[in-house]
Amino acid sequence: LYPLTENFPKPLLKVREKAILDWLIEDIETCKLIEEYIVISNHKYLNHFKEWARDKKYKLTIIDDGTYTNDTRLGAVKDIQYATDSLRLSDDLLIIAGDNLLDFSLTRLIEYAKEKKTSCIMRFYQSDIEKLKKAGVACVDADDLIIDMEEKPKNPKCNWCTPPFYFLLKEDVKLIKKGIEERCGTDAPGSFIAWLSKQVPVHAMLMPGNRYDIGDIISYEEVKREYKGIAR
């Protein structure tokens, strides 16, 4: 999204006069189940997030992972581990990428996870094989249980694409360190989920709506034109 994001974080870009991150958090707030929001930023964008957080009414912590560039970044999985270690987190986590929007409520995933009593992700049908090769792909059984998952597969085994929205049980959060030690892959959070699904049951909820991935200028302009908000 350069030059828009050269000196400005993508999650704070505006869609219909509201930052992407505000769309996500204001929706999640409706379930009244989240005790604290934690935003992990590199050092370069830290002050932007601090300014954004200044007038928020909910409990919010901004974490600086100490990195400056793409070349030195920790990767999403190590960022999550860094936050859990720094804040000594010992609770269930809802993990979301700040550059995606949904037209349905994320509280549906929370409710689904409470019903399944496992860590859970979401899935949607993707017919484009080339897009599947750039995403996390999860094959499931009749009960939505993940039976195979791979991040950016060369040969996708099914058409279920998994966007970066995850509900992790606290006991599974404790396995992140082990996953990193066993080289689960640390750039995309889906790499950890793929590893985790081979250790414990993980379910993948069929999405009841659409996801908008804001990856470049074209997709950003498209979202600004088409996004209608979250249907309840």
Where are these regions (language model features)?
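N-terminal nucleotide-binding beta1-loop-alpha1 segment
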Residues: 1-6, 12, 201
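Conserved N-terminal catalytic core of the sugar/cofactor nucleotidyltransferase
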Residues: 13-14, 18-96, 108
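Residue-level signal for inorganic ion chemistry
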Residues: 21, 83, 99, 138, ...
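Conserved beta-strand termini and adjacent loop/short-helix elements that scaffold enzyme active sites
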Residues: 40, 63-66, 123, 152, ...
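A short, conserved beta-strand element in the Rossmann-like catalytic core
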Residues: 100-103, 211
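Conserved donor-nucleotide/metal-binding helix-loop-beta segment in metal-dependent transferases, i.e.
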Residues: 104-133
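Catalytic-core segments of class I nucleotidyltransferases/pyrophosphorylases
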Residues: 110-114, 145-213, 217-232
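Short acidic-glycine loop/turn motifs at beta-strand connectors
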Residues: 139-145
